[in-house]
Amino acid sequence: MGNTTSEIQTQNVEAQPLISTEEQLSVDNPSIQSDQSVDTVENTVNDTVNDTVENTVNDTVQSIINKKYVHPVIDLINSNQSENEIIEVLKSFVGTNVVGTNENGQTIYDCVDQVELFGPAMQVFCHCACYGKKDVTDWILKNYVPLQVSYGDNFTFFETQKYKHFDISDMLVKHESFVPSYEVMQNLLSRSKYDLLEHCLNNPNLEKSHIDHYNLFIQYLSNKQYSNINELLVSLKKDSNTPIVSGNESETQPLQVTEIVNVNDNVTLDEISYSEIVTDTLPQNVESGIQLESTTEVKPESTTEVKPESTSEVQPESTTEFQPESTTVVEPESTTKVEPESTTEFQPESTTEVEPESTTEPQVESTTEFQPESSTEPQVESTVEVQAESMNESSYFQYNKPTYDI
């Protein structure tokens, strides 16, 4: 019996595997387990780094947004630093620092571009002058070259007067960039600053267009007629509401366009149209009238003759000649007859232009018009014969009336 039980247990043990499938895989392929662990570590590290960087960036951006940049020179206005500390900061930005000496023993300075810091320097200057920081104001007046003490119509001068910093306002008057005005000179006159008033009159920035006024100022100052100076300043202030500007500064006015001229580059020339040929007619006392055509010419080969018994002729005036147009020649019509009852004689006008008084206008398409291209020559059917006699190429024409029996 004992042997049977042991045999059954041996068979069960042999039927079961010695290790599990997962353990067998890890034993057979040890790289699988190592790769999984590496991936886990990498993911953990990446997440940690990303979170750290993101938090750091967000904190930095938020700090930049919350804190606005202020220039160190402008920051001097809000600080409680002493005047010496302010001067040291100004020296580091706009001052001239001594670097050393060269081979010849000359001093070498480190100069900066002061124009780049014009805005901050002007703000610090106005602040220190108005709040009575005389040492800083004096340092800026002597060391900052682009300084303009009269900006804003001498704003700093009148602010120092407002806060009763008269010594600083007197320092401004002596600066080379100061532009004196009538109000400034009145202020100096009221405070008995005659030397500064004379300095303003000799200031090159003072407008000296009215030389008579300048001479009067000098005369009143030399004679100590200060009341006259005040009256002159008041009268000049009434005449001119604008402050006196420097002679170097030009008063520029905006350009005003008064007229706008449109110019077209595409020039189109109109076609030259010659005047149409106009046919003028003489006063018509006959049936169809005598027509003047521009293209007709007098035929010199006409065989018609004037009978000697003709006693009535149309004689042009002694001083007036009938001048037809340059291309117009009179062509007598073959079918026209002279009415004996007509007592009207044709008198050419002195203006050499024939203006027909008849209400009948010449018809271009009339059958009585002579066609130069026609081969038919005019036939004289009546007893009246008209001769167009040419004295020369530019002579006048005579029209002879024939005699008739009553």
UniProtKB/Swiss-Prot annotation:
The organism's taxonomic lineage, starting at the top: Viruses, Varidnaviria, Bamfordvirae, Nucleocytoviricota, Megaviricetes
Biased composition (Basic and acidic residues): 296-310
UniProt keyword annotations, A-Z: Lipoprotein, Myristate
Source organism (scientific name): Acanthamoeba polyphaga mimivirus
Low complexity biased stretches: 324-333, 341-351, 359-369
Recorded superkingdom: Viruses
Keyword Lipoprotein included in the entry's annotation: yes
Name of the protein in its database record: Uncharacterized protein R554
Region annotated Disordered, chain positions: 291-406
